[in-house]
């Protein structure tokens, strides 16, 4: 199956393209799709592609495949994106503001999905066989995500020469990604009456000491293939107390460790335990390895040239790691601004949507 036709088509004008991208993004934002509830948006995307004459199939478990699904005689490129969002923060449905879309998922990553859909519907001539991969539950821990199992089921996808994940990057090629551990850190003291604190051993004090030491450690910066990654561990939640007049004997923190792409999961776990276990007990909830930048891939240079900007390291975990685990080299490039992802005022500009389309169209064209 070919991802794009070889029949010449008339390119749409920039104003028309921009309007369609904005309308498409708002349309997608207005379909609620919090992780685990992607059925409506999945059905909508399939219907839109079928109506536009794009070969598409429901691959099960909130996954859809359009265009090419395995390598043919030409190089094989995948465009990939997730359909789900984090929970709403009084920012749904979306709205048009100025020259862009404001609303849940606009940046991460319904703007990117809108670009994917418009590229697929254009069916423009290409130097590649192009496939489109859409999936759900990306915002959940990787063990619950849909992409990894899809790559196991649809082995032809693993023949791709490059996968481009349209995560928010502000239209810069961001290569590689950090590994990601979430863990529960439990601090144990001795409960007591708040009127006699000298008879207790406050777990809050123990937690503050441990978290303070963890946060005092400077990020560890590492250059890989010319790109700088920062390894860092932070506490993202702290819970303690059973009553207002009881000094707690137990406190719990959630620790998030973003680790070097060079580390395997076991090495990262040992490093986090070394940092934490002098103060409390650590229980891992999830551990997902990162991915190294595919700088030697010739398609990387082609995409960078199309973007017109120097590449950056991806200071986050993204599905490029799942592609890498399946043997597919992958990079991130999308219209959203990563600084706006998951924010209450999340948004994406019309200019960024158009620029993302132009970069990918230039990369894919003959």
Provide a role label for each language-model segment.
Residues 2, 16, 168, 175-176, ...:
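Metal-dependent amide/peptide-bond hydrolase catalytic core
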Residues 84-97, 160, 175-186, 331:
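Acidic-glycine-rich active-site phosphate/pyrophosphate-binding loop
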Residues 9-39:
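N-terminal capping segment at the start of a domain
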Residues 114-182:
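Acidic/histidine-rich catalytic neighborhood of metal-dependent amide-processing enzymes
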Residues 74-134:
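Active-site metal-coordination/substrate-binding segment of hydrolases
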Residues 45, 113-123, 150, 207-210, ...:
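Buried hydrophobic packing segments
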Residues 39-43, 113, 266-270:
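Short, surface-exposed alpha-helical segments at coil->helix boundaries
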Residues 27, 33-73:
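A non-catalytic alpha/beta surface segment that caps or lines the substrate-entry region
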